[in-house]
């Protein structure tokens, strides 16, 4: 089974970013009781793990097309400052950049 590396890295980065933002906000944790411990996994999966949405975000035909993949990520994450990131000019040419 082949796992596309770039989407996995992007998703893990977003998860780390989400965790870091939650930690910086100082969210208070609830007490763990038997009632909310038993209801925890179902609520967690329904809230955070929407597999159909993730599959529609990364289509298989876009994995080899870096520009289509980058544009897809830009559409999915419009709140990031994309001008601060380096441009993908080097990926457009068939010849490698001179070093």
From Swiss-Prot:
Keyword Signal recorded: yes
Intracellular or extracellular location(s): Secreted
Classification via Pfam families: KRTDAP
Tissue-specific expression: Highly expressed in skin, but not detectable in any other tissue examined. Expression restricted to cornified/stratified epithelia and not detected in non-cornified/stratified epithelia.
Keywords, comma-separated and alphabetical: Differentiation, Secreted, Signal
GO biological process: cell differentiation; epidermis development
GO cellular component: extracellular space
Signal peptide segment: 1-22
Role according to the record: May act as a soluble regulator of keratinocyte differentiation. May play an important role in embryonic skin morphogenesis.
The name this protein goes by in its record: Keratinocyte differentiation-associated protein
Classification of source organism: Eukaryota, Metazoa, Chordata, Craniata, Vertebrata
